[in-house]
């Protein structure tokens, strides 16, 4: 389909605090046709929740936001911040012009000033109920990516029965050194994070103190 080849979507995330969120985010990226998931800063994450979708998704890593921005601009790609700002446009208005990378903010504090500086425009997700001030980052990403796919004219995936057909995994796969935590450790991590509400999805203060870069074989560079 012409539009599918013409436009691409990317997801951009910066200095992950909740590493296991990337697994569920990767699942949404594959469902909505994202070309690449770009990590900036920290790159150690857990594939928990991805249901194998990381095998069908391209990853890329940069050490700084400026390098990520340069990469995207070389591909004539806009950077869209998903944030409620004075000039943000409702995502259902589809204010897209070309291939777009979506930068998602902290569920508690939103995008930092540094992150906002690299954005070309902003979208927000209208809410119609009064019980919450924000959405989980993966839920927000899914809504925004779906709207972009509709605007870009992406082809709907073939269905079989009550599910969509999953493509075969690539025969040649790079080494994927996922953070090999157990389900129990993830549950415990989530419990501790709930007790410490200051931890958000992005956290500029988080230091990567892992003994090695856990995904050296996963990223294009």
Range-by-range predicted roles:
Residues 1-221:
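Post-transcriptional modification and biogenesis factors for structured RNAs
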């Amino acid at each position: 389909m012409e539009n599918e080849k013409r436009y691409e979507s990317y997801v951009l995330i910066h200095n992950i605090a909740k590493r296991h969120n990337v697994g569920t985010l990767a699942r949404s990226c594959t469902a909505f046709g994202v070309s690449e998931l770009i990590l900036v800063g920290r790159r150690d994450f857990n594939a928990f929740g991805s249901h194998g979708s990381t095998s069908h998704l391209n990853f890329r890593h940069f050490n700084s936001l400026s390098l990520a921005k340069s990469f995207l601009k070389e591909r004539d790609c806009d950077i869209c911040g998903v944030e409620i700002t004075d000039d943000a446009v409702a995502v259902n208005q589809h204010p897209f012009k070309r291939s777009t990378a979506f930068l998602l903010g902290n569920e508690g504090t939103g995008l930092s000033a540094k992150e906002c500086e690299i954005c070309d425009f902003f979208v927000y997700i209208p809410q119609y109920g009064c019980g919450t001030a924000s959405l989980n980052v993966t839920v927000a990403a899914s809504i925004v990516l779906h709207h972009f796919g509709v605007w870009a004219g992406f082809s709907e995936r073939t269905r079989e029965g009550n599910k969509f057909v999953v493509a075969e995994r690539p025969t040649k796969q790079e080494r994927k050194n996922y953070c090999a935590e157990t389900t129990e450790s993830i549950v415990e991590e989530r419990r501790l994070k709930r007790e410490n509400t200051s931890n958000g999805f992005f956290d500029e203060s988080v230091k990567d103190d892992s003994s090695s870069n856990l995904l050296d074989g996963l990223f294009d560079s």
